[in-house]
Amino acid sequence: MPILELLSRAEKLKQAISIITDDIDHHLLALAPSADLDNYKKFLTLQYVYQLELKGLYEHADLHQYIDNLHDRTRLSLIKQDLDDLKHPLPNHQQYPCRFQNADFAYVLGWLYVIEGAQFSAATLGKQVEAELKLNNQRGARYLAKASEYSKDCQLNHLIDNLELCEQQQATLIEGAEQALQRFKFYQAQLY
């Protein structure tokens, strides 16, 4: 039996996007967001612009049926507070709040998988920022502290593994995850 058949749907999704995820992680690591305040402010600016686009994701009606505290998971206000703590202006950026309004459930679930999965990296970065820049959940690193809260959350993987999805919906799930990563790379290229 091929190994791929032994993987859960969430594990297959993770494997399907692993190359682009690794590429983003390596690029962010090379930018050294915890090395100094200027690098960290650029990182927060990137997160802010990306989170602006995600507002509609946290309002998607179908996701609310399955994901507890979905509204609480948005971190845009925390990034605003962090940038304010650091006396850094908010970027002038157009919002795209309706991107997810009529999107297919499997597609937005793929996006959410990427966003929530990024919390593992953010939690690690939060520890580095606290150690190297002396920022924390009270000043300058609220966003990263909140990410740490959800980094061990298995609810989403459980949902992905147990939903009844046809082949097309499974492909749409992967497409959503890939689009989320490509969109992040787009903003990363613009801001760095």
Which residue stretches match the model-derived regions?
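Metal- and O2-centered redox machinery and metal/ROS homeostasis
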Residues: M1-Y192
